């Protein structure tokens, strides 16, 4: 009896995209406080508030993103949200005020919430049911690998540049 094929191109793409998403998330996480303090002279309370905006936005969008993914086409929603997620990184550099930075942080959190729900949904769709648990394990492993290398890389980049 042969196993259903799990390592399809679609699975490899979503796995790589998931790794890169979380790598970017963990890359910037440890250095945002430094950036806000250095560029905007933000205090600890303001930094905490700004960093929290992202997570709160991601939490708020998740139930709605689930509904949208069940109602509309999943792949385009995933790609648009992923594009927004990537584009916001450039917005951070261009932000000239804390208000704009907060707005970007909220949009970034919304896109992250949508991308993560969409990615989870898509990976379940493309995995054969007989290998779904194994595939989701590998999919989650991409997050852990990103968590292992992202902060270290971000802090290294901050110290060098």
Predicted regions and their residues:
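Helix-loop boundary and gating motifs at the non-cytosolic
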Residues: 7-47
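Helix-breaking motifs and short loop linkers at transmembrane-helix boundaries and internal kinks
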Residues: 41, 73, 94-99
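Cytoplasmic helix-loop-helix junction between adjacent transmembrane helices
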Residues: 106-141
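Paired small-residue
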Residues: 99-107
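Structural signature of the two symmetry-related core transmembrane helices
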Residues: 76-90
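Residue-level signature of mid-helix packing/kink "hotspots" within the transmembrane helices
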Residues: 55-63, 147-148
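Helix-to-loop junctions at the C-terminal end of transmembrane segments
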Residues: 61-73
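Structural signature of transmembrane alpha-helices in multi-pass secondary transporters
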Residues: 22, 51-54, 139-147
């Amino acid at each position: 009896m042969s196993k259903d094929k799990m390592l399809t191109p679609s699975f490899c793409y979503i796995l790589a995209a998931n790794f890169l998403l979380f790598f970017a998330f963990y890359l910037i996480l440890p250095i945002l406080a430094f950036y806000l303090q250095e560029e905007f002279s933000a205090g600890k309370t303001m930094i905490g508030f700004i960093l929290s905006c992202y997570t709160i936005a991601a939490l708020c969008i998740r139930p709605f993103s689930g509904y949208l993914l069940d109602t509309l086409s999943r792949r385009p929603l995933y790609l648009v949200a992923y594009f927004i997620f990537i584009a916001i990184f450039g917005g951070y550099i261009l932000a000239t005020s804390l208000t704009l930075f907060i707005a970007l942080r909220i949009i970034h959190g919304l896109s992250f919430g949508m991308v993560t729900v969409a990615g989870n949904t898509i990976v379940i769709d493309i995995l054969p049911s007989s290998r779904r648990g194994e595939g989701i394990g590998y999919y989650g492993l991409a997050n852990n690998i990103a968590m292992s290398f992202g902060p270290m890389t971000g802090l290294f980049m901050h110290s060098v540049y």
